[in-house]
Structure formats: structure tokens, C-alpha cells
From Swiss-Prot:
One of its GO terms (molecular function) is protein folding chaperone. The gene is groES. GO terms for cellular component: cytoplasm. It comes from the Bacteria. The keyword Chaperone applies. CDD domains: cpn10 (cd00320). Together with the chaperonin GroEL, plays an essential role in assisting protein folding. The GroEL-GroES system forms a nano-cage that allows encapsulation of the non-native substrate proteins and provides a physical environment optimized to promote and accelerate protein folding. GroES binds to the apical surface of the GroEL ring, thereby capping the opening of the GroEL channel. This is Co-chaperonin GroES.
Length: 94
């Protein structure tokens, strides 16, 4: 498992459906890229100039929407994750 550093979070992307409601199977190039996923790990937070630590505002298990081009894709074994900074998270899905 990945352990993010500082104000970074690890997200497991939510995959889009590969078949439309009418039964058409989409190829990888036809699928719309998703920018939604589930937080699987959070860093320790950002450290301010005065040494104070600011905790990250999301928790493991939160479903989030993030900037479409934010973060770095990391593969470990068969799993693929996005590691991004907390400020690249747009919203928590409730």
C-alpha cells in the first residue's frame, strides 16, 4: 500500500461503465475519463512556516471529485492509484 507524504492523498479511481444502457460496449478510447474516486490513504498534513501542522480535510473512505489533470498515476501490482495534493480535490461526494 502507498503511504502519502505531507499534504498528499491516495485515491483509487472509480471506473466508468464499459457498456451503455442500450448494450453498446465502449472501447477504451470512447470511454470518458473519470475524475472521481475513493480516498484510500492520507498524508500527515501540511506544515506551516510556524511549524504548526494542518490536518488534511478528507478521510479514508471518502468519495471525492478531483481536478481532471491533477495528480500522478501510480501502479502497485494489479492496482492503479492517483496520488495528488489535497488542494487538487474539488469536492467530497455525499
Amino acid at each position: 500500500m502507498l503511504k502519502p507524504y505531507g499534504n498528499r492523498v491516495v485515491i483509487q479511481k472509480t471506473e466508468r461503465e464499459t457498456t451503455t444502457a442500450s448494450g453498446i460496449v465502449l472501447t477504451d478510447s470512447a470511454k470518458e475519463k473519470t475524475n472521481e474516486g475513493t480516498v484510500v490513504a492520507v498524508g500527515t498534513g501540511r506544515i506551516l512556516n510556524n511549524g504548526e501542522r494542518v490536518e488534511i480535510g478528507v478521510s479514508v473512505g471518502d468519495r471525492v471529485v478531483y481536478e481532471p489533470f491533477g495528480g500522478t498515476e501510480v501502479k502497485t501490482g494489479d492496482e492503479s492509484y492517483i496520488v495528488l495534493k489535497e488542494e487538487d480535490i474539488i469536492a467530497i461526494v455525499e
